[in-house]
From Swiss-Prot:
Gene3D superfamilies: 3.30.70.330. This is RNA annealing protein YRA1. Residues 208-226 have a biased composition (Basic and acidic residues). GO terms for biological process: mRNA export from nucleus; transcription elongation by RNA polymerase II; transcription-coupled nucleotide-excision repair. Residues 78-158 form the RRM domain. GO terms for cellular component: nucleus; transcription export complex. RNA-binding RNA annealing protein. May have a role in pre-mRNA metabolism. Component the TREX complex, which operates in coupling transcription elongation to mRNA export. The keyword Cell membrane does not apply. The lineage of its organism: Eukaryota, Fungi, Dikarya, Ascomycota, Saccharomycotina.
Length: 226
């Protein structure tokens, strides 16, 4: 592993992919002796009839799958957990490798133990979900150091996380004051209400018309009092 100090992470992964393909071609099964099952007396040991293992439903709920897909399609940052990195590789080398192979690397956080040594684990934050998904598809399961270990990449997505609203959606403008503000429209009196109000008022009785004799009599009474 000390020879990896002079190599980049790109060279380590590239050489291991070629070596793993050659190992698969030459690893065919030979014509060795076959194993013979043990017999008890003249009969083979019979196994009890089993229906097979019980399959568990490991499928995620459709709501969670839809939420994860929606989060990956947005422009928000998405983290990827990487395990199996060579422990003599520095944090800057991890950043340079994924930035050149995938792009959009925002932050890289390499994990260290209490002695200050790398644990081979890192959290990489990508610019969006598409770049994070591309990194997982390309490098998940890639051999390291001649196939001694393999990279494991996992997306870190919280399906309960709500999408962040833009700043324009979260800020509301203050109401304008002064002449620019719209003035309230003045409405005239309601005719129906005015007519109903006038009808409810008691009508004043008009004084009866007086004759000339009544007027002369009132004049005579007025002068007599004086």
């Amino acid at each position: 592993m000390s020879a990896n100090l002079d190599k980049s992470l790109d060279e380590i992964i590239g050489s291991n992919k070629a070596g793993s393909n050659r190992a698969r071609v030459g690893g065919t099964r030979g014509n060795g002796p076959r194993r013979v099952g043990k017999q008890v007396g003249s009969q083979r040991r019979s196994l009890p009839n089993r229906r097979g293992p019980i399959r568990k439903n490991t499928r995620a709920p459709p709501n969670a799958v839809a939420r994860v897909a929606k989060l990956l399609d947005t422009t928000r940052e998405v983290k990827v957990n990487v395990e199996g990195l060579p422990r003599d590789i520095k944090q800057d080398a991890v950043r340079e490798f994924f930035a050149s192979q995938v792009g959009g690397v925002q932050r890289v956080l390499l994990s260290y133990n209490e002695r200050g040594q790398s644990t081979g684990m890192a959290n990489i934050t990508f610019k969006n979900g598409e770049l994070a998904r591309r990194a997982v598809e390309r490098f998940n399961g890639s051999p390291i150091d001649g196939g001694r270990s393999r990279l494991r990449l996992n997306l870190i997505v919280d399906p309960n996380q709500r999408p962040v609203k833009s700043l324009a959606d979260r800020i509301k403008a203050m109401p304008q004051k002064g002449g620019n503000a719209p003035r309230p429209v003045k409405r005239g009196p309601n005719r129906k209400a005015a007519m109903a109000k006038s009808q409810n008022k008691p009508k004043r009785e008009k004084p009866a018309k007086k004759s000339l004799e009544d007027l002369d009599k009132e004049m005579a009474d007025y002068f007599e009092k004086k």
